[in-house]
């Protein structure tokens, strides 16, 4: 008997993705995707780490102005992933977005390399002779520099959110009973491999810049970015490329508009509501959830004749939305408080320029008998080493051991991990303040109060604990937040989920700039404040204590947000599994 045309078409549609899943995607694509982001991170982080020194020496910007420029650049770099995620999910698709972004990053790095190669595009060298004033950078010179920063930010905005989601697309398989564990492991190892790239940036690239100069130090990242784009495009035939949906933000705006238009509508009782809400035929949601119930008015059918056409579809999508649209907006609104708690940790991590100046003023030898000095810009490697070590230990030792002891798979709830990371971030700032107090006190006792360029007789290894704590905090909260967003959001919002942590870092850098300037202005006594170009004259220990206090308040804020959020998707699923397991055990006992 011949199938009706619509059933045949449906069967072909179902079979097509299954065939694609067998022939494309999988672990084979991981080296190309991770290599693309890895090389991008080596290039961009390698440029960032020493950039404050480049701005102060070659462009003659003061510490506060130079750091403010870097705060804004990093903020733009971390904000652009939201734009990239929107374009990816709604218009371009993840593959094309990554290709365009790689080209933008490459152009930005070439322009930055040109600022080092061409003397006329930056201030002339400062000659230290009597009566000679050093010229400042002109508007056109700064414009070229900022153009390079902007192109790099645009590139990062397309690569970073899409690479993570694009990689997850290659592995995500709902038919696999271990799908959750595969994705959790993927997120951890993805961050670990990205962190290896950052580690290379903090060591190799920084070393090259310190010893071979800016021309080679900026040229190598450009070459790496070219290699990153080539490798990604080379593997194009192997990728699973999901189709884009309609504009996500348009759909969210329609929910807000429809809910407002029908704000006076009385919602049906819960037990009578199944047929009162508008949904598409292939939707699994028969009715919206009870949380943020006022948004349910957007998908409530008030008058079938006025709201629906003869084909059963909405006549006006700005007045009647689907249940899926409503739940997407709810998912986004619901995570905002939890998302905001990660901002303070990102503010703490963004203080690397001050830590760079601290390291430059200290004894950076590995031991008193050693002649090798760790470059000041390379101390960030201890943060990355701590992050990688935790990922490996957690994934390969802690979880397997706990699962073996309990006799069943064990996972540490993502909300617990995020909270622990925020508390460790508070400890990191408390340690930073204590170490800086000791460093400054030692510098003054050695008569170096007015000489920030001399080395204080104190080992820079005292800075390692705070870097390690920052790494643990980021491993717990950073990876935890990304996993949290990805599992709580619908799959059509994967790139948005991957970009939210970066958006938090963007907001953090803007707030860090505000806090920095506020502390500098409010602490000024005469011509000296807590924030000075000469760190021996300033009081960076007091500044760190301000951040530590804010971090502790943030931990309390997180506890409140976590409690009010309620159970996560994983918690609900695990409760169901545990309930079924208990029922099976009871049946076995009865038999």
From Swiss-Prot:
It is a multi-pass membrane protein. Keywords: Cell membrane, Membrane, Transmembrane, Transmembrane helix, Transport. One of its GO terms (biological process) is nitrate transmembrane transport. The chain crosses the membrane at residues 68-88, 98-118, 139-159, 186-206, 216-236, 329-349, 374-394, 418-438, 460-480, 496-516, 543-563. It is found in: Cell membrane. Pfam families: PTR2. InterPro entries: MFS_trans_sf, POT_fam. Disruption phenotype: Nrt1.11 and nrt1.12 double mutant is defective in high-nitrate-enhanced growth. GO terms for cellular component: plasma membrane. Expressed in siliques, shoots and roots. Mainly detected in larger expanded leaves, in the companion cells of major veins. GO terms for molecular function: low-affinity nitrate transmembrane transporter activity. Belongs to the major facilitator superfamily. Proton-dependent oligopeptide transporter (POT/PTR) (TC 2.A.17) family. Low-affinity nitrate transporter involved in xylem-to-phloem transfer for redistributing nitrate into developing leaves. Not involved in dipeptides transport. This is Protein NRT1/ PTR FAMILY 1.1. It comes from Arabidopsis thaliana.
């Amino acid at each position: 008997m011949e199938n009706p045309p619509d059933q045949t078409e449906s069967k072909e549609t179902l079979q097509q993705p299954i065939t694609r899943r067998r022939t494309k995607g999988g672990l084979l694509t991981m080296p190309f995707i991770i290599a693309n982001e890895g090389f991008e991170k080596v290039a961009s982080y390698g440029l960032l780490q020493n950039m404050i020194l480049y701005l102060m020496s070659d462009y003659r910007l003061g510490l506060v102005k130079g750091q403010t420029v870097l705060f804004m650049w990093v903020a733009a770099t971390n904000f652009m992933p939201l734009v990239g995620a929107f374009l990816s999910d709604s218009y371009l698709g993840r593959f094309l977005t990554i290709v365009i972004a790689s080209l933008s990053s490459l152009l930005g790095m070439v322009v930055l390399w040109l600022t080092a190669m061409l003397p006329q595009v930056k201030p002339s060298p400062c000659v230290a002779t009597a009566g000679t004033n050093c010229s400042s950078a002109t508007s056109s010179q700064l414009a070229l520099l900022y153009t390079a920063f902007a192109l790099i930010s645009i590139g990062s905005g397309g690569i970073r959110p899409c690479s993570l989601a694009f990689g997850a697309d290659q592995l995500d398989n709902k038919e696999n009973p271990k799908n959750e564990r595969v994705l959790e492991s993927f997120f951890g190892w993805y961050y670990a491999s990205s962190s290896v790239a950052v580690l290379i940036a903090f060591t190799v690239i920084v070393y090259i810049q310190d010893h071979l100069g800016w021309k080679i130090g900026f040229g190598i990242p450009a070459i790496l970015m070219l290699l990153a784009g080539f490798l990604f495009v080379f593997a194009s035939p192997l990728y699973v490329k999901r189709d884009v949906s309609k504009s996500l933000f348009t759909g969210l705006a329609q929910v807000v508009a429809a809910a407002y238009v029908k704000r006076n509508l009385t919602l049906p009782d819960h037990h009578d509501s199944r047929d009162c809400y508008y949904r598409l035929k292939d939707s699994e949601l028969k009715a919206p959830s009870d949380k943020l119930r006022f948004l349910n008015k957007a998908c409530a059918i008030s008058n079938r004749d006025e709201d629906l056409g003869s084909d059963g579809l909405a006549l006006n999508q700005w007045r009647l939305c689907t249940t899926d649209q409503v739940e997407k907006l709810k998912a986004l609104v619901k995570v905002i408080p939890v998302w905001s708690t990660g901002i303070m940790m990102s503010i703490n991590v963004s203080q690397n320029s001050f830590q760079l100046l601290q390291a430059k003023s200290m004894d950076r030898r590995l031991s008193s008998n050693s002649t090798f000095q760790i470059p000041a810009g390379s101390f960030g490697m201890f943060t990355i080493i701590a992050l990688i070590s935790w990922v490996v230990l957690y994934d390969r030792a802690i979880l397997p051991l706990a699962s073996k002891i309990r006799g069943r798979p064990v996972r540490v709830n993502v909300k617990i991990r995020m909270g622990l990371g925020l508390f460790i971030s508070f400890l990191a700032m408390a340690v930073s303040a204590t170490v800086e107090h000791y460093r400054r006190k030692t510098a003054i006792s050695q008569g170096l109060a007015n000489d920030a360029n001399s080395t204080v007789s104190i080992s820079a290894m005292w800075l390692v604990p705070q870097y390690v704590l920052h790494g643990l905090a980021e491993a717990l909260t950073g990876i935890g937040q990304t996993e949290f967003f990805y599992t709580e959001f619908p799959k059509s919002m994967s790139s948005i989920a991957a970009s939210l942590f970066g958006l938090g870092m963007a907001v953090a850098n803007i707030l860090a700039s505000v806090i920095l300037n506020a502390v500098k202005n409010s602490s000024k006594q005469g011509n000296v404040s807590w924030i000075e170009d000469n760190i021996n004259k300033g009081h960076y220990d007091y500044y760190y204590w301000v951040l530590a206090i804010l971090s502790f308040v943030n931990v309390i804020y997180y506890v409140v947000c976590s409690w009010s959020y309620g159970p996560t998707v994983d918690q609900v699923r695990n409760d169901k599994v545990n309930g079924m397991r208990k029922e099976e055990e009871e049946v076995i006992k009865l038999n």
